[in-house]
Amino acid sequence: MEITTIDTKSKLKLNKEIFAYTYNEGLVHQAVVTFMNNARSGNSAQKTRSEVSGGGKKPWNQKGTGRARAGTIRSPLWRSGGVTFASKKRDYSQKLNKKMYKRALRSIISELCRTGNLVVVSDFQCDNHKTKDFLKKMNQMEISSALIIMSEVGENEYLGSRNLIDYDICDVTTIDPVSLLRFEKVVVTEAAIKKIEEQLQ
């Protein structure tokens, strides 16, 4: 299996086991859900009526005042009271076996390759850290939204792209299923291709 680099027009051989893998939609969905759940902090919490400070004394007598009966100022019906069904801290993290995770990444990368959304370049380097120069480089490649995967991310490339919502840049070790699916294109350097093949073997 071969792919042509868009800058030098040279042919690059790809490993069929990684770049021509059968697409498994269920596994990809599981990998995406697991990744997003693992990113959740789960720190949202409120207090029930028993946890809110104060409210131990009955506000007024049960009868004789003409007011509605009340047993505590921390009732959920009251201002500053507890929450009826208070949410608590919880762990949303899920486990996905390494083999399954690798297969999910293979599925996504292979599908990108099949649909023509995987773009290979011989190298990707920016002369400076300016965002306008980074955008100019991407416009020359006619790519409006992309994840750029490099073997090692340089400072200029990182600084030039970090303020743009339509572009993201990462090295091979930090590839994740959500980023691969989020952008229109995935731009990969030749050096990164070799590392991806080693990592997902």
UniProtKB/Swiss-Prot annotation:
Domain of life: Bacteria
Gene Ontology cellular component terms for the protein in this record: ribonucleoprotein complex; ribosome
Pfam family, one: Ribosomal_L4
GO-annotated molecular function: rRNA binding; structural constituent of ribosome
Record GO biological process: translation
Chain intervals for the UniProt region annotation (Disordered): 42-67
Keyword Ribosomal protein: yes
PANTHER family: 50S RIBOSOMAL PROTEIN L4, LARGE RIBOSOMAL SUBUNIT PROTEIN UL4M
Subunit structure: Part of the 50S ribosomal subunit.
Free-text function comment from the UniProt entry: One of the primary rRNA binding proteins, this protein initially binds near the 5'-end of the 23S rRNA. It is important during the early stages of 50S assembly. It makes multiple contacts with different domains of the 23S rRNA in the assembled 50S subunit and ribosome. Forms part of the polypeptide exit tunnel.
Family: Belongs to the universal ribosomal protein uL4 family.
Name assigned to this protein: Large ribosomal subunit protein uL4
